[in-house]
A protein has these predicted regions:
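Alpha/beta-hydrolase-fold enzymes
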Residues: 166-251
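Conserved serine/cysteine hydrolase catalytic core
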Residues: 271-280
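N-terminal cap/lid segment of alpha/beta-hydrolase-fold proteins
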Residues: 28-74
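The serine-hydrolase catalytic nucleophile loop
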Residues: 86-98, 112
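Short beta-strand element of the alpha/beta-hydrolase
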Residues: 74-84
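Alpha/beta-hydrolase fold nucleophile elbow
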Residues: 147-159
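Conserved alpha/beta-hydrolase
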Residues: 99-119
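Alpha/beta-hydrolase active-site loop
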Residues: 125-146
Length: 280
């Protein structure tokens, strides 16, 4: 009997050690926030600004810019902002957030999981589930603030984040208003291509084959390849929407070194999860 207890005790200690190791290995990496103003837009004199972080239910830490009106009194309505898809909070989502704070809202612009200053490995990865949770976690954060009226929380999704915002709003009655700005449905874009140009069995198979080959290549090289950001140099015959992307992300107006759209884009397989999911 004594020997049995000894074996059980050893097993418990071993299991505890394994659990501690797993916990240490899966612990979210500590993120480092840039405290200097490095936005692509001027700082407003009408609002106070600070960097904040909050957790998602996937255990990731999101970095956000918090904007509060200097004239704030009592509990205020609040807005969470994100997008465009592949952009960061230092770009237009931050400008939207700051502008809405000037108009009396407490706002945050956040970096989605795996991008910008937020945590998550490998970098530049997208997921319809995780990205929807990003918005819900932002609502969690705002709803717990003492200066926020939790009954008046809204979200703004820009470009590809417009579809994600709508998906989040269908799941969370705490979201009282939703705005989708120049919306793309990223599930449809990844599945069918821009303007449904690849809406055929042959095109979809080619996409799946390319993703599979990219995964194999990454495994062999033991690194993740990037798909590339906005095309540079800009072809003369580029469609207007590509010219619009270039005019923002690749010029001083909107370029930022942490932005995938401004630099090397998503991982080659980083948006694969969107292809067989539909928001709308």
């Amino acid at each position: 009997m004594k020997r049995i207890f000894t074996i059980l005790a050893a097993a418990i200690i071993c299991c505890a050690g394994i659990q501690a190791k797993v916990k240490a290995e899966t612990k979210d990496k500590e993120i480092k926030l840039v405290q200097d103003w490095d936005k692509t837009f001027p700082k407003s004199e009408k609002v106070n600004h600070e960097k904040v972080t909050f957790k998602t239910q996937y255990g990731l830490t999101l970095a956000a810019d918090l904007y509060i009106p200097k004239s704030a009194e009592g509990k205020l309505p609040a807005i969470a902002v994100s997008g465009p898809f592949g952009a960061i909070k230092e770009q237009c989502s931050g400008l939207y957030a700051q502008t809405m704070a000037e108009r009396g809202f407490i706002t945050i612009a956040f970096d989605p999981s795996f991008t910008g200053e937020s945590s998550g490995e490998p970098r530049r990865t997208a997921s319809p589930d995780i990205n929807t949770e990003d918005f819900l976690a932002a609502v969690d954060y705002l709803s717990m603030r003492d200066d926020v009226d939790a009954g008046r929380i809204a979200i703004i999704g820009i470009c590809g984040w417009g579809g994600i915002a709508l998906n989040a709003a269908t799941q969370d009655p705490r979201i009282k208003a939703t705005a989708a700005i120049t919306m793309y449905d990223m599930t449809r874009v990844n599945g069918n291509g821009y303007f449904d140009a690849d809406d055929s069995e042959e095109s979809r198979y080619s996409a799946r084959k390319a993703w599979a080959e990219a995964r194999t290549a990454d495994l062999k090289k033991k690194t993740f390849t990037q798909a590339g950001g906005v095309v540079d140099p800009l072809p003369e015959d580029a469609p207007q929407f590509i010219k619009d992307y270039y005019a923002y992300y690749k010029t001083p107006r909107g370029y930022h070194k942490r932005s995938g759209n401004s630099t090397d884009g998503w991982r080659t397989t980083g948006c694969q999860a969107y292809a067989n999911t539909r928001f709308l």
